[in-house]
Protein backbone atom coordinates (compact mmCIF):
# COMPACT_ATOMS: atom_id res chain seq x y z
CA UNK A 1 0.00 0.00 0.00
CA UNK A 2 2.92 2.34 0.76
CA UNK A 3 3.97 2.74 -2.83
CA UNK A 4 0.38 3.36 -3.93
CA UNK A 5 0.22 6.53 -1.87
CA UNK A 6 3.19 8.06 -3.64
CA UNK A 7 1.20 9.20 -6.66
CA UNK A 8 0.39 12.86 -7.01
CA UNK A 9 -2.53 13.63 -9.28
CA UNK A 10 -2.95 17.31 -10.14
CA UNK A 11 -5.91 18.73 -12.04
CA UNK A 12 -5.36 22.30 -13.23
CA UNK A 13 -8.57 24.17 -12.40
CA UNK A 14 -7.93 26.80 -15.12
CA UNK A 15 -7.54 24.24 -17.91
CA UNK A 16 -10.03 21.51 -16.90
CA UNK A 17 -13.40 22.12 -18.63
CA UNK A 18 -15.71 19.06 -18.28
CA UNK A 19 -18.51 20.86 -20.19
CA UNK A 20 -16.36 21.19 -23.31
CA UNK A 21 -14.95 17.65 -23.57
CA UNK A 22 -16.16 14.08 -23.63
CA UNK A 23 -14.58 13.13 -20.28
CA UNK A 24 -11.78 11.29 -22.12
CA UNK A 25 -9.83 10.92 -18.85
CA UNK A 26 -12.59 8.84 -17.26
CA UNK A 27 -13.26 6.73 -20.36
CA UNK A 28 -9.62 5.81 -20.89
CA UNK A 29 -8.76 5.00 -17.25
CA UNK A 30 -8.12 1.24 -16.79
CA UNK A 31 -9.10 1.44 -13.09
CA UNK A 32 -12.50 2.96 -13.96
CA UNK A 33 -13.00 0.24 -16.58
CA UNK A 34 -12.44 -2.40 -13.92
CA UNK A 35 -15.35 -0.89 -11.96
CA UNK A 36 -13.63 1.36 -9.38
CA UNK A 37 -14.27 5.10 -9.10
CA UNK A 38 -10.74 6.35 -9.74
CA UNK A 39 -11.78 9.40 -11.80
CA UNK A 40 -15.08 11.07 -10.99
CA UNK A 41 -16.37 13.64 -13.48
CA UNK A 42 -19.70 14.61 -15.00
CA UNK A 43 -20.43 17.42 -17.49
CA UNK A 44 -21.93 19.35 -14.54
CA UNK A 45 -18.86 19.11 -12.27
CA UNK A 46 -16.47 22.07 -12.15
CA UNK A 47 -13.32 19.97 -12.46
CA UNK A 48 -12.46 16.27 -12.52
CA UNK A 49 -11.58 14.51 -9.27
CA UNK A 50 -8.86 11.84 -9.31
CA UNK A 51 -8.45 9.49 -6.36
CA UNK A 52 -4.74 9.15 -5.58
CA UNK A 53 -5.33 5.97 -3.55
CA UNK A 54 -6.85 4.14 -6.54
CA UNK A 55 -4.62 5.65 -9.25
CA UNK A 56 -2.04 3.19 -10.61
CA UNK A 57 0.06 5.88 -12.32
CA UNK A 58 -0.39 4.44 -15.82
CA UNK A 59 -0.17 7.94 -17.32
CA UNK A 60 -2.96 7.46 -19.88
CA UNK A 61 -5.29 10.26 -18.71
CA UNK A 62 -2.70 13.10 -19.04
CA UNK A 63 -2.18 12.04 -22.69
CA UNK A 64 -5.90 11.75 -23.41
CA UNK A 65 -6.97 15.08 -21.85
CA UNK A 66 -7.64 17.53 -24.73
CA UNK A 67 -6.75 20.55 -22.56
CA UNK A 68 -3.59 19.13 -20.97
CA UNK A 69 -5.08 19.73 -17.51
CA UNK A 70 -3.89 16.55 -15.76
CA UNK A 71 -0.45 15.80 -14.32
CA UNK A 72 0.36 12.46 -12.70
CA UNK A 73 3.68 12.12 -10.88
CA UNK A 74 5.29 9.29 -8.97
CA UNK A 75 7.07 10.55 -5.85
CA UNK A 76 9.80 8.94 -3.73
CA UNK A 77 8.03 6.98 -0.95
CA UNK A 78 9.93 8.70 1.87
CA UNK A 79 8.37 12.06 0.96
CA UNK A 80 4.83 10.91 1.58
CA UNK A 81 5.19 11.22 5.35
CA UNK A 82 6.49 14.79 5.13
CA UNK A 83 3.61 16.79 3.65
CA UNK A 84 3.43 20.22 5.27
CA UNK A 85 0.51 21.72 3.40
CA UNK A 86 -1.93 20.92 0.63
CA UNK A 87 -4.50 23.40 -0.62
CA UNK A 88 -7.26 21.00 -1.80
CA UNK A 89 -7.81 17.66 -3.53
CA UNK A 90 -5.73 17.30 -6.72
CA UNK A 91 -3.86 20.55 -6.07
CA UNK A 92 -0.37 21.78 -5.14
CA UNK A 93 1.34 20.32 -2.09
CA UNK A 94 4.43 21.39 -0.18
CA UNK A 95 6.80 18.93 1.53
CA UNK A 96 8.86 19.95 4.58
CA UNK A 97 9.57 23.56 5.57
CA UNK A 98 12.64 25.78 5.57
CA UNK A 99 14.12 26.08 9.06
CA UNK A 100 14.88 29.67 10.09
CA UNK A 101 17.61 30.14 12.71
CA UNK A 102 17.72 33.17 15.00
CA UNK A 103 20.46 35.69 14.23
CA UNK A 104 21.09 34.61 10.64
CA UNK A 105 19.63 35.23 7.17
CA UNK A 106 17.93 32.28 5.47
CA UNK A 107 17.83 32.44 1.66
CA UNK A 108 15.24 30.48 -0.34
CA UNK A 109 16.07 29.57 -3.93
CA UNK A 110 13.86 27.75 -6.42
CA UNK A 111 11.75 28.29 -9.54
CA UNK A 112 8.41 30.11 -9.62
CA UNK A 113 5.33 28.19 -8.44
CA UNK A 114 7.28 25.73 -6.31
CA UNK A 115 6.03 26.87 -2.88
CA UNK A 116 8.36 29.66 -1.72
CA UNK A 117 5.49 32.08 -1.09
CA UNK A 118 3.46 29.28 0.54
CA UNK A 119 6.41 28.59 2.88
CA UNK A 120 6.62 32.31 3.72
CA UNK A 121 2.88 32.44 4.46
CA UNK A 122 3.20 29.47 6.84
CA UNK A 123 6.29 30.87 8.58
CA UNK A 124 4.70 34.31 8.98
CA UNK A 125 1.66 32.71 10.68
CA UNK A 126 -0.80 33.77 7.96
CA UNK A 127 -1.45 30.18 6.88
CA UNK A 128 -1.85 27.23 9.24
CA UNK A 129 -0.13 24.11 7.86
CA UNK A 130 -2.67 21.30 7.39
CA UNK A 131 -0.10 18.47 6.99
CA UNK A 132 -1.87 17.37 3.80
CA UNK A 133 -5.25 16.84 5.54
CA UNK A 134 -7.24 19.46 3.64
CA UNK A 135 -10.61 17.85 4.54
CA UNK A 136 -10.05 17.71 8.34
CA UNK A 137 -7.19 20.11 9.19
CA UNK A 138 -5.28 19.37 12.42
CA UNK A 139 -5.27 21.82 15.35
CA UNK A 140 -2.12 23.69 16.44
CA UNK A 141 -1.24 21.10 19.11
CA UNK A 142 -1.00 18.39 16.47
CA UNK A 143 1.05 20.63 14.18
CA UNK A 144 3.55 21.39 16.95
CA UNK A 145 3.68 17.70 17.89
CA UNK A 146 4.41 16.88 14.23
CA UNK A 147 7.41 19.25 14.17
CA UNK A 148 8.76 18.17 17.59
CA UNK A 149 12.49 17.69 17.82
CA UNK A 150 13.21 20.25 15.12
CA UNK A 151 13.92 23.97 15.31
CA UNK A 152 10.44 24.56 13.91
CA UNK A 153 8.83 23.30 17.15
CA UNK A 154 9.96 26.36 19.15
CA UNK A 155 9.13 28.57 16.19
CA UNK A 156 5.51 27.40 15.89
CA UNK A 157 5.08 27.47 19.69
CA UNK A 158 5.99 31.17 19.56
CA UNK A 159 3.53 31.74 16.69
CA UNK A 160 0.80 30.03 18.71
CA UNK A 161 1.47 32.18 21.78
CA UNK A 162 1.49 35.32 19.60
CA UNK A 163 5.10 35.95 20.60
CA UNK A 164 6.28 36.28 17.02
CA UNK A 165 5.60 39.47 15.10
CA UNK A 166 6.26 38.93 11.40
CA UNK A 167 6.65 41.71 8.81
CA UNK A 168 6.57 40.78 5.12
CA UNK A 169 7.74 42.79 2.11
CA UNK A 170 5.34 41.64 -0.62
CA UNK A 171 6.50 40.27 -3.97
CA UNK A 172 4.49 42.57 -6.24
CA UNK A 173 5.40 46.10 -5.13
CA UNK A 174 3.51 47.66 -8.05
CA UNK A 175 0.26 46.79 -6.24
CA UNK A 176 1.18 48.79 -3.11
CA UNK A 177 -0.44 52.11 -4.21
CA UNK A 178 -3.83 50.35 -4.62
CA UNK A 179 -3.55 48.85 -1.13
CA UNK A 180 -2.91 52.16 0.68
CA UNK A 181 -6.17 53.19 2.34
CA UNK A 182 -5.05 56.20 4.42
CA UNK A 183 -6.03 59.74 3.32
CA UNK A 184 -2.38 60.88 3.63
CA UNK A 185 -0.47 58.86 1.04
CA UNK A 186 2.98 60.47 1.32
CA UNK A 187 6.07 58.31 1.80
CA UNK A 188 6.92 60.31 4.95
CA UNK A 189 3.58 59.60 6.66
CA UNK A 190 3.52 55.90 5.69
CA UNK A 191 7.07 55.22 6.93
CA UNK A 192 6.84 57.31 10.12
CA UNK A 193 3.47 55.87 11.13
CA UNK A 194 5.02 52.36 11.16
CA UNK A 195 8.37 53.34 12.66
CA UNK A 196 9.22 51.48 15.87
CA UNK A 197 13.05 51.45 15.74
CA UNK A 198 15.52 54.32 15.76
CA UNK A 199 17.25 53.52 12.47
CA UNK A 200 15.14 55.85 10.28
CA UNK A 201 18.04 58.09 9.15
CA UNK A 202 20.22 55.12 8.24
CA UNK A 203 17.38 53.54 6.22
CA UNK A 204 16.59 56.80 4.38
CA UNK A 205 20.25 57.40 3.48
CA UNK A 206 21.12 53.83 2.46
CA UNK A 207 17.99 53.35 0.34
CA UNK A 208 18.13 56.92 -1.10
CA UNK A 209 14.60 57.75 0.02
CA UNK A 210 15.20 61.39 1.03
CA UNK A 211 14.37 62.97 -2.33
CA UNK A 212 11.04 61.11 -2.59
CA UNK A 213 10.17 61.56 1.11
CA UNK A 214 7.36 64.06 0.51
CA UNK A 215 6.00 62.42 -2.63
CA UNK A 216 2.70 60.60 -2.95
CA UNK A 217 3.05 56.79 -3.14
CA UNK A 218 0.89 56.70 -6.26
CA UNK A 219 3.54 58.75 -8.15
CA UNK A 220 6.52 56.49 -7.45
CA UNK A 221 8.30 54.40 -10.11
CA UNK A 222 8.88 50.64 -9.69
CA UNK A 223 12.36 51.04 -8.19
CA UNK A 224 11.20 53.78 -5.81
CA UNK A 225 8.25 51.64 -4.67
CA UNK A 226 10.61 48.72 -4.06
CA UNK A 227 12.96 50.84 -1.91
CA UNK A 228 9.97 52.33 -0.07
CA UNK A 229 8.61 48.82 0.65
CA UNK A 230 12.00 47.60 1.94
CA UNK A 231 12.38 50.79 4.04
CA UNK A 232 8.91 50.39 5.56
CA UNK A 233 9.76 46.85 6.72
CA UNK A 234 13.21 47.85 8.02
CA UNK A 235 11.97 50.61 10.38
CA UNK A 236 9.56 48.26 12.19
CA UNK A 237 10.56 46.22 15.22
CA UNK A 238 9.66 42.59 14.65
CA UNK A 239 10.80 39.05 15.38
CA UNK A 240 10.60 37.79 11.79
CA UNK A 241 11.49 39.84 8.72
CA UNK A 242 10.56 38.39 5.34
CA UNK A 243 11.55 39.82 1.98
CA UNK A 244 9.93 38.38 -1.15
CA UNK A 245 12.16 39.33 -4.12
CA UNK A 246 13.70 42.53 -2.73
CA UNK A 247 15.84 43.24 -5.80
CA UNK A 248 13.37 43.46 -8.70
CA UNK A 249 13.27 46.94 -10.30
CA UNK A 250 16.54 47.94 -8.55
CA UNK A 251 19.91 48.55 -10.22
CA UNK A 252 23.11 46.84 -9.05
CA UNK A 253 24.10 49.63 -6.65
CA UNK A 254 20.64 49.74 -5.04
CA UNK A 255 20.55 45.92 -4.79
CA UNK A 256 23.73 45.93 -2.72
CA UNK A 257 22.46 48.83 -0.58
CA UNK A 258 19.22 46.90 0.04
CA UNK A 259 21.28 43.80 0.94
CA UNK A 260 23.31 45.81 3.46
CA UNK A 261 20.23 47.33 5.13
CA UNK A 262 18.55 43.88 5.31
CA UNK A 263 21.65 42.40 6.97
CA UNK A 264 21.69 45.29 9.46
CA UNK A 265 18.36 43.99 10.88
CA UNK A 266 20.05 40.92 12.36
CA UNK A 267 19.92 40.61 16.14
CA UNK A 268 20.71 37.46 18.17
CA UNK A 269 17.00 36.70 18.64
CA UNK A 270 15.33 37.65 15.33
CA UNK A 271 14.86 35.76 12.07
CA UNK A 272 15.38 37.12 8.53
CA UNK A 273 14.12 35.15 5.52
CA UNK A 274 14.75 36.23 1.92
CA UNK A 275 13.38 34.88 -1.38
CA UNK A 276 15.56 36.12 -4.22
CA UNK A 277 16.15 35.21 -7.87
CA UNK A 278 19.28 37.29 -8.46
CA UNK A 279 21.79 34.67 -7.34
CA UNK A 280 24.69 37.08 -6.76
CA UNK A 281 22.53 39.16 -4.37
CA UNK A 282 21.20 36.03 -2.63
CA UNK A 283 24.80 34.88 -2.20
CA UNK A 284 25.79 38.26 -0.70
CA UNK A 285 22.75 38.41 1.61
CA UNK A 286 22.34 34.95 3.08
CA UNK A 287 24.11 32.99 5.80
CA UNK A 288 22.63 29.69 4.64
CA UNK A 289 20.24 28.53 1.92
CA UNK A 290 17.32 26.11 1.47
CA UNK A 291 16.73 24.92 -2.10
CA UNK A 292 13.19 24.14 -3.28
CA UNK A 293 12.74 21.59 -6.05
CA UNK A 294 9.83 19.70 -7.57
CA UNK A 295 7.45 20.58 -10.37
CA UNK A 296 5.89 24.06 -10.56
CA UNK A 297 2.21 24.11 -9.49
CA UNK A 298 2.33 20.35 -8.76
CA UNK A 299 4.53 19.79 -5.71
CA UNK A 300 7.51 21.42 -4.01
CA UNK A 301 10.11 19.94 -1.66
CA UNK A 302 12.35 21.97 0.64
CA UNK A 303 15.88 20.61 1.16
CA UNK A 304 17.77 20.70 4.44
CA UNK A 305 19.76 23.92 5.01
CA UNK A 306 23.08 24.20 3.15
CA UNK A 307 25.89 26.74 3.27
CA UNK A 308 25.34 29.59 0.80
CA UNK A 309 27.88 28.48 -1.77
CA UNK A 310 26.88 24.84 -1.61
CA UNK A 311 23.14 25.60 -1.72
CA UNK A 312 23.33 27.79 -4.82
CA UNK A 313 25.66 25.32 -6.54
CA UNK A 314 23.20 22.48 -5.78
CA UNK A 315 20.41 24.54 -7.35
CA UNK A 316 22.48 25.24 -10.48
CA UNK A 317 23.77 21.69 -10.72
CA UNK A 318 20.29 20.17 -10.39
CA UNK A 319 21.55 17.38 -8.11
CA UNK A 320 21.27 17.05 -4.31
CA UNK A 321 24.17 14.91 -3.06
CA UNK A 322 22.74 14.41 0.47
CA UNK A 323 19.53 12.87 -0.90
CA UNK A 324 21.22 11.44 -4.02
CA UNK A 325 18.49 12.95 -6.16
CA UNK A 326 18.59 14.66 -9.54
CA UNK A 327 15.76 17.17 -9.99
CA UNK A 328 16.83 18.74 -13.30
CA UNK A 329 18.14 17.05 -16.45
CA UNK A 330 21.02 19.44 -17.17
CA UNK A 331 23.15 21.65 -14.94
CA UNK A 332 23.39 25.40 -15.49
CA UNK A 333 26.88 26.88 -15.87
CA UNK A 334 28.31 30.29 -16.66
CA UNK A 335 31.35 29.64 -18.80
CA UNK A 336 31.96 32.80 -20.81
CA UNK A 337 33.66 30.81 -23.53
CA UNK A 338 30.82 28.37 -24.13
CA UNK A 339 28.73 31.00 -25.86
CA UNK A 340 31.40 32.05 -28.29
CA UNK A 341 32.75 28.62 -29.25
CA UNK A 342 29.46 27.45 -30.72
CA UNK A 343 28.92 30.50 -32.82
CA UNK A 344 31.91 31.79 -34.74
CA UNK A 345 30.12 34.67 -36.36
CA UNK A 346 31.28 36.48 -39.45
CA UNK A 347 31.14 40.13 -38.49
CA UNK A 348 30.46 41.46 -41.95
CA UNK A 349 28.41 44.59 -41.37
CA UNK A 350 29.35 47.41 -39.06
CA UNK A 351 26.94 50.12 -37.90
CA UNK A 352 27.91 53.49 -36.46
CA UNK A 353 26.04 56.03 -34.38
CA UNK A 354 27.24 59.62 -33.87
CA UNK A 355 28.10 61.48 -30.66
CA UNK A 356 24.85 63.12 -29.54
CA UNK A 357 23.12 64.90 -26.70
CA UNK A 358 19.54 64.78 -25.52
CA UNK A 359 17.82 67.01 -22.99
CA UNK A 360 14.56 65.91 -21.38
CA UNK A 361 13.34 68.51 -18.85
CA UNK A 362 16.12 68.79 -16.25
CA UNK A 363 17.86 65.63 -17.44
CA UNK A 364 20.73 65.72 -19.91
CA UNK A 365 22.33 62.69 -21.58
CA UNK A 366 25.64 62.88 -23.47
CA UNK A 367 26.46 59.93 -25.72
CA UNK A 368 29.94 59.18 -27.10
CA UNK A 369 30.10 58.05 -30.72
CA UNK A 370 30.34 54.29 -31.10
CA UNK A 371 30.04 51.43 -33.54
CA UNK A 372 28.77 47.86 -33.43
CA UNK A 373 28.64 44.90 -35.78
CA UNK A 374 26.13 42.12 -36.37
CA UNK A 375 26.04 38.96 -34.22
CA UNK A 376 26.95 41.07 -31.23
CA UNK A 377 25.24 41.67 -27.89
CA UNK A 378 25.93 44.97 -26.18
CA UNK A 379 24.82 45.24 -22.55
CA UNK A 380 24.18 48.66 -21.05
CA UNK A 381 25.27 48.95 -17.44
CA UNK A 382 24.49 51.84 -15.16
CA UNK A 383 22.29 52.98 -12.32
CA UNK A 384 18.58 53.65 -12.74
CA UNK A 385 17.99 57.13 -14.14
CA UNK A 386 21.25 57.40 -16.10
CA UNK A 387 19.53 57.42 -19.49
CA UNK A 388 19.75 53.78 -20.65
CA UNK A 389 16.13 53.69 -21.81
CA UNK A 390 16.55 57.19 -23.35
CA UNK A 391 19.54 55.88 -25.32
CA UNK A 392 17.45 52.90 -26.53
CA UNK A 393 14.76 55.30 -27.71
CA UNK A 394 17.32 57.52 -29.47
CA UNK A 395 18.60 54.46 -31.36
CA UNK A 396 15.06 53.40 -32.20
CA UNK A 397 14.30 56.85 -33.60
CA UNK A 398 11.44 57.43 -31.14
CA UNK A 399 13.35 60.44 -29.74
CA UNK A 400 15.39 62.89 -31.83
CA UNK A 401 18.80 64.08 -30.53
CA UNK A 402 19.34 67.80 -29.79
CA UNK A 403 20.69 69.99 -32.60
CA UNK A 404 21.20 68.72 -36.13
CA UNK A 405 22.69 65.31 -35.24
CA UNK A 406 20.80 62.43 -36.83
CA UNK A 407 20.91 58.73 -36.04
CA UNK A 408 21.08 56.56 -39.19
CA UNK A 409 17.76 54.81 -39.74
CA UNK A 410 17.67 51.15 -38.80
CA UNK A 411 14.86 48.66 -38.36
CA UNK A 412 14.47 48.20 -34.64
CA UNK A 413 12.41 45.84 -32.47
CA UNK A 414 12.06 46.87 -28.84
CA UNK A 415 10.89 45.12 -25.67
CA UNK A 416 9.95 47.89 -23.22
CA UNK A 417 10.76 47.79 -19.51
CA UNK A 418 7.17 47.77 -18.30
CA UNK A 419 4.66 45.47 -19.96
CA UNK A 420 0.95 46.30 -19.84
CA UNK A 421 -1.26 43.71 -21.56
CA UNK A 422 -3.98 45.42 -23.59
CA UNK A 423 -4.58 42.62 -26.11
CA UNK A 424 -7.98 40.92 -26.00
CA UNK A 425 -7.50 37.24 -26.72
CA UNK A 426 -5.12 34.34 -26.14
CA UNK A 427 -1.34 34.25 -26.42
CA UNK A 428 -1.59 32.21 -29.62
CA UNK A 429 -3.88 34.81 -31.23
CA UNK A 430 -1.46 37.56 -30.21
CA UNK A 431 1.47 35.74 -31.88
CA UNK A 432 -0.54 35.09 -35.04
CA UNK A 433 -1.49 38.74 -35.24
CA UNK A 434 1.96 40.22 -34.57
CA UNK A 435 4.62 37.67 -35.61
CA UNK A 436 2.86 35.02 -37.68
CA UNK A 437 5.80 34.29 -40.04
CA UNK A 438 8.34 33.85 -37.24
CA UNK A 439 5.95 31.89 -35.01
CA UNK A 440 5.30 29.35 -37.77
CA UNK A 441 8.99 28.89 -38.63
CA UNK A 442 10.43 25.65 -37.17
CA UNK A 443 13.80 27.32 -36.45
CA UNK A 444 12.14 30.05 -34.33
CA UNK A 445 10.05 27.41 -32.53
CA UNK A 446 13.11 25.34 -31.53
CA UNK A 447 15.37 28.34 -30.78
CA UNK A 448 12.93 30.57 -28.90
CA UNK A 449 9.40 29.28 -28.22
CA UNK A 450 10.17 25.73 -26.97
CA UNK A 451 13.00 26.61 -24.51
CA UNK A 452 10.89 29.39 -22.93
CA UNK A 453 8.09 26.81 -22.32
CA UNK A 454 5.32 28.93 -23.80
CA UNK A 455 3.21 25.84 -24.55
CA UNK A 456 2.13 25.75 -20.90
CA UNK A 457 0.01 28.89 -21.30
CA UNK A 458 -0.28 29.44 -25.07
CA UNK A 459 -4.09 29.16 -25.02
CA UNK A 460 -4.66 31.36 -21.98
CA UNK A 461 -5.95 34.92 -22.13
CA UNK A 462 -3.10 37.46 -22.30
CA UNK A 463 -4.76 39.56 -19.58
CA UNK A 464 -4.72 36.70 -17.06
CA UNK A 465 -0.99 35.92 -17.33
CA UNK A 466 1.40 36.31 -14.39
CA UNK A 467 4.39 38.66 -14.50
CA UNK A 468 6.88 35.94 -15.50
CA UNK A 469 4.61 34.58 -18.24
CA UNK A 470 4.05 38.08 -19.68
CA UNK A 471 7.79 38.69 -19.66
CA UNK A 472 8.45 35.55 -21.72
CA UNK A 473 5.66 36.48 -24.17
CA UNK A 474 7.23 39.95 -24.54
CA UNK A 475 10.70 38.47 -25.24
CA UNK A 476 9.24 36.18 -27.94
CA UNK A 477 7.31 39.09 -29.49
CA UNK A 478 10.43 41.28 -29.58
CA UNK A 479 12.58 38.55 -31.16
CA UNK A 480 9.86 37.57 -33.62
CA UNK A 481 9.74 40.94 -35.41
CA UNK A 482 12.30 41.11 -38.26
CA UNK A 483 14.80 43.91 -37.47
CA UNK A 484 18.48 44.92 -37.67
CA UNK A 485 18.71 45.78 -34.00
CA UNK A 486 16.90 44.24 -31.03
CA UNK A 487 16.62 46.47 -27.98
CA UNK A 488 15.60 44.48 -24.89
CA UNK A 489 14.98 46.39 -21.66
CA UNK A 490 15.37 44.27 -18.49
CA UNK A 491 14.58 40.77 -19.80
CA UNK A 492 15.04 39.25 -16.31
CA UNK A 493 12.27 41.10 -14.45
CA UNK A 494 9.74 38.67 -12.88
CA UNK A 495 11.65 35.61 -14.17
CA UNK A 496 13.04 33.09 -11.69
CA UNK A 497 16.71 32.13 -11.58
CA UNK A 498 16.28 29.14 -13.89
CA UNK A 499 14.20 31.03 -16.46
CA UNK A 500 16.74 33.88 -16.44
CA UNK A 501 19.52 31.56 -17.55
CA UNK A 502 17.25 29.96 -20.19
CA UNK A 503 16.17 33.41 -21.43
CA UNK A 504 19.77 34.61 -21.74
CA UNK A 505 20.70 31.45 -23.68
CA UNK A 506 17.71 31.95 -25.99
CA UNK A 507 18.58 35.60 -26.67
CA UNK A 508 22.27 34.77 -27.24
CA UNK A 509 21.57 31.88 -29.61
CA UNK A 510 18.95 33.85 -31.54
CA UNK A 511 21.24 36.86 -32.06
CA UNK A 512 24.09 34.61 -33.26
CA UNK A 513 21.90 32.61 -35.68
CA UNK A 514 20.05 35.63 -37.03
CA UNK A 515 23.32 37.62 -37.40
CA UNK A 516 21.75 40.69 -35.82
CA UNK A 517 22.74 43.06 -33.01
CA UNK A 518 21.14 43.32 -29.59
CA UNK A 519 21.28 46.15 -27.07
CA UNK A 520 20.25 44.88 -23.65
CA UNK A 521 19.63 46.71 -20.37
CA UNK A 522 20.13 44.28 -17.48
CA UNK A 523 20.69 44.68 -13.74
CA UNK A 524 21.12 41.02 -12.82
CA UNK A 525 24.91 40.92 -12.91
CA UNK A 526 25.18 37.18 -13.57
CA UNK A 527 22.85 37.47 -16.57
CA UNK A 528 24.50 40.65 -17.86
CA UNK A 529 27.98 39.12 -17.87
CA UNK A 530 26.69 35.92 -19.49
CA UNK A 531 25.03 37.84 -22.32
CA UNK A 532 27.53 40.59 -23.05
CA UNK A 533 30.05 40.66 -25.88
CA UNK A 534 30.70 44.32 -25.19
CA UNK A 535 29.49 46.81 -22.60
CA UNK A 536 28.38 50.46 -22.62
CA UNK A 537 28.87 52.00 -19.17
CA UNK A 538 26.53 54.84 -18.15
CA UNK A 539 27.81 57.13 -15.41
CA UNK A 540 26.97 60.55 -13.98
CA UNK A 541 24.28 61.80 -11.63
CA UNK A 542 21.04 59.81 -11.96
CA UNK A 543 18.13 61.94 -13.16
CA UNK A 544 20.29 65.06 -13.69
CA UNK A 545 23.33 64.63 -15.89
CA UNK A 546 24.48 61.33 -17.39
CA UNK A 547 27.11 60.17 -19.84
CA UNK A 548 27.18 57.06 -22.06
CA UNK A 549 30.69 55.81 -22.85
CA UNK A 550 31.55 54.12 -26.12
CA UNK A 551 31.19 50.31 -26.27
CA UNK A 552 34.12 48.57 -24.50
CA UNK A 553 35.13 44.94 -24.04
CA UNK A 554 33.37 42.99 -21.28
CA UNK A 555 36.39 43.01 -18.97
CA UNK A 556 37.24 46.74 -19.15
CA UNK A 557 33.55 47.73 -19.15
CA UNK A 558 32.74 45.68 -16.03
CA UNK A 559 35.87 46.97 -14.31
CA UNK A 560 34.86 50.60 -15.02
CA UNK A 561 31.30 49.95 -13.87
CA UNK A 562 32.29 48.11 -10.67
CA UNK A 563 34.92 50.73 -9.84
CA UNK A 564 32.12 53.34 -9.80
CA UNK A 565 30.17 51.06 -7.44
CA UNK A 566 33.24 50.15 -5.32
CA UNK A 567 32.40 46.43 -5.48
CA UNK A 568 34.58 43.48 -6.49
CA UNK A 569 33.59 40.07 -7.86
CA UNK A 570 35.33 36.69 -7.81
CA UNK A 571 34.35 33.56 -9.70
CA UNK A 572 33.11 30.30 -8.27
CA UNK A 573 35.51 27.49 -9.24
CA UNK A 574 32.82 24.87 -9.96
CA UNK A 575 30.40 26.65 -12.26
CA UNK A 576 32.10 30.02 -12.83
CA UNK A 577 29.25 32.18 -11.57
CA UNK A 578 30.30 35.67 -10.42
CA UNK A 579 30.23 36.08 -6.62
CA UNK A 580 30.37 39.40 -4.76
CA UNK A 581 33.25 39.80 -2.30
CA UNK A 582 32.28 40.96 1.19
CA UNK A 583 33.27 44.60 1.70
CA UNK A 584 36.86 45.02 3.00
CA UNK A 585 37.53 41.28 2.98
CA UNK A 586 41.08 40.26 2.07
CA UNK A 587 40.16 39.37 -1.53
CA UNK A 588 38.21 42.61 -1.87
CA UNK A 589 41.20 44.72 -0.80
CA UNK A 590 43.64 42.71 -2.95
CA UNK A 591 41.49 43.06 -6.08
CA UNK A 592 40.95 46.80 -5.51
CA UNK A 593 44.69 47.37 -5.14
CA UNK A 594 45.46 45.46 -8.35
CA UNK A 595 42.52 47.13 -10.18
CA UNK A 596 40.88 43.77 -11.02
CA UNK A 597 37.27 44.35 -10.00
CA UNK A 598 36.02 41.51 -12.19
CA UNK A 599 37.44 38.28 -13.66
CA UNK A 600 36.43 36.87 -17.01
CA UNK A 601 37.57 33.29 -16.56
CA UNK A 602 39.09 31.74 -13.49
CA UNK A 603 39.96 28.08 -13.26
CA UNK A 604 39.73 26.03 -10.07
CA UNK A 605 43.55 25.99 -9.75
CA UNK A 606 43.74 29.79 -9.50
CA UNK A 607 41.03 29.81 -6.86
CA UNK A 608 42.92 27.17 -4.86
CA UNK A 609 46.14 29.22 -5.02
CA UNK A 610 44.22 32.17 -3.58
CA UNK A 611 42.58 30.29 -0.79
Curated annotation (Swiss-Prot):
CDD domains associated with the record: ABC_RNaseL_inhibitor_domain1
Ligand binding (ATP): 110-117, 382-389
ABC transporter domain residues are 77-318, 345-565
This protein's GO cellular component annotations are: cytoplasm; nucleus
GO biological processes: rRNA processing
Q: What are the subcellular locations of this protein?
A: Cytoplasm; Nucleus
According to the record's subunit comment, the protein's assembly and interactions are: Component of the multifactor complex (MFC). The complex associates with pre-initiation complexes.
Q: Record's PANTHER family?
A: ATP-BINDING TRANSPORT PROTEIN-RELATED (PTHR19248)
The family line of this record is: Belongs to the ABC transporter superfamily. ABCE family.
What is the protein's given name?
Translation initiation factor RLI1
**Organism listed in the record:** Chaetomium thermophilum (strain DSM 1495 / CBS 144.50 / IMI 039719)
Q: Which gene encodes it?
A: RLI1
